[in-house]
Amino acid sequence: MNRIFGRGKPKGPPPNLTDCISGVDSRAESVDKKIARLDAELMKYKDQMKKMRDGPSKNMVKQKAMRVLKQKRMYEGQRDQLMQQSFNMEQANYTIQTLKDTKTTVEAMKIGAKEMKKAYKNVKIDQIEDLQDQLEDMMEDANEVQEALSRSYGTPEIDEDDLEAELDALGDELLLDDDNSYLDEASSAPAIPEGAPGDRTTNRDGVLVDEFGLPQIPAT
């Protein structure tokens, strides 16, 4: 049968919006180039008419410029249509891509919810509470062991009378520490001799004193 009727042409991949957008944009660029060439031609006719006087020759150039302008307006309309088509397809393509992303997100969330359910099935609150109770009991036992190990032996009993006596004794010691009279006595002691033996000096009262600051007895 294939020999008689021949084989059908293999079907190509279906068109997608991205390829369509590229094709439309390429056509719009081609139209822009044509418009640019027509603009250059209009400028040429403009320069010619500036140099010409009114008459049949100038009117002929003006008619050519009118035909070029009509072509330009036609191409501009085509370009605007192509640009609008491209914009519409881009919006549609964006919407489709957004929907695909949303679908992927929803599927991922569903998979995550299933995994969470499976994980929670293996978690039992009663077992966790029992484990917490066991840990609390073990901590209490450990504290009791520490208290037993830190117990002191042979410590004398202390009553309130012993405490008051100790505090009174501490107060007396503090008073003794605050008594600085011995410092005054030390400061009033004779100073170290400064002069050489035999030097004659006087104190503040004008009395002769020796090198130790002691009054000298006059020789008789």
From Swiss-Prot:
Compositionally biased spans, kind Basic residues: 1-10
Compartments in which it is found: Cytoplasm, Cytosol; Endosome membrane
Gene Ontology biological process terms in this record: late endosome to vacuole transport via multivesicular body sorting pathway; protein transport; vesicle budding from membrane
The entry's keywords: Coiled coil, Cytoplasm, Endosome, Membrane, Protein transport, Transport
Pfam families associated with the record: Snf7
Gene Ontology terms: cellular component: cytosol; endosome membrane; multivesicular body
Tagged with keyword Cytoplasm: yes
Annotated region described as Disordered, given as residue ranges: 1-27, 178-206
Annotated membrane topology: Peripheral membrane protein
InterPro entries in the cross-refs: Snf7_fam (IPR005024)
Keyword Protein transport: yes
Functional note: Probable peripherally associated component of the endosomal sorting required for transport complex III (ESCRT-III) which is involved in multivesicular bodies (MVBs) formation and sorting of endosomal cargo proteins into MVBs. MVBs contain intraluminal vesicles (ILVs) that are generated by invagination and scission from the limiting membrane of the endosome and mostly are delivered to lysosomes enabling degradation of membrane proteins, such as stimulated growth factor receptors, lysosomal enzymes and lipids.
Subunit organization: Probable peripherally associated component of the endosomal sorting required for transport complex III (ESCRT-III).
Protein name: Charged multivesicular body protein 5
